[in-house]
Design a protein with these regions (language model features):
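N-terminal capping/small domains of soluble enzymes
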Residues: 1-23
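Structural beta-sheet core signal
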Residues: 5, 10-12, 39, 81, ...
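Alpha/beta enzyme core
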Residues: 18-150, 166-174
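Short, surface-exposed acidic/glycine-rich loop or hinge patches that mediate macromolecular interfaces
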Residues: 124, 157-159
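Conserved mixed alpha/beta core segments that line enzyme active sites in large multi-domain catalysts
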Residues: 151-157
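Short glycine/serine/threonine-rich phosphate/pyrophosphate-binding segments
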Residues: 159-165
């Protein structure tokens, strides 16, 4: 069983997250013995003020929660990181996305992350857009020789979800 822990809305004040309080979802997972986790993060401009909460601070927060999962849930936990707002993030902060992916790839060498997910939450992005995002994310992963999983979560709308999944598969095939 995998439990999703949403990092993007945890104690956000003035568009800066609470970096000290352990998310309630992680604490509950520990109580009941669950350990496979999807940590979700927003990288677009709507949730955080990245002038106050820098990409480096975001990466350190992810690293802290990942380490917390290994230390407190299970040393063999399968942890996925989900970029919840990839269309917004790629439109306004693609470099930010690539910085976080690069950081996670380097971290995965020692931490053994299971993989990455990116989400198209509105079902409005064209399959070619999602395919391009997947291609560049996978390229960063490949450049680091990280064989972690790359998954996509597309919400249904306008019939793009199936076409998008096929396009992403095509853009990352052979990797």
């Amino acid at each position: 069983m995998v439990v999703t822990i949403l990092l993007s809305f945890l104690g956000v004040a003035d568009k800066v997250p609470d970096t000290e309080t352990i998310p309630v979802g992680l604490r509950k997972m520990k109580e009941v013995g669950l350990y496979n986790v999807i940590l979700e993060i927003d990288l677009g401009n709507s949730t955080y003020d990245f002038n106050k909460f820098t990409v480096d601070k975001c990466c350190l927060l992810l690293e802290n929660w990942i380490q917390w999962c290994y230390d407190n849930l299970n040393k063999n936990a399968k942890i996925l990181i989900n970029f919840r707002d990839i269309p917004d993030a790629m439109a306004t902060g693609a470099v930010r996305v690539f910085q976080v992916v690069d950081f996670l790839c380097k971290l995965s060498a020692s931490e053994g992350l299971f993989g990455l997910i990116f989400e198209e939450p509105r079902g409005k992005s064209l399959p070619e857009e999602c395919g391009t995002w997947a291609k560049y994310i996978r390229k960063i992963m490949d450049d680091h020789k990280w064989k972690g999983h790359l998954l996509i979560h597309v919400h249904e709308k306008f019939g793009y979800s199936d076409a998008t999944a096929l396009q992403v598969n095509t853009c990352t095939r052979g990797r």
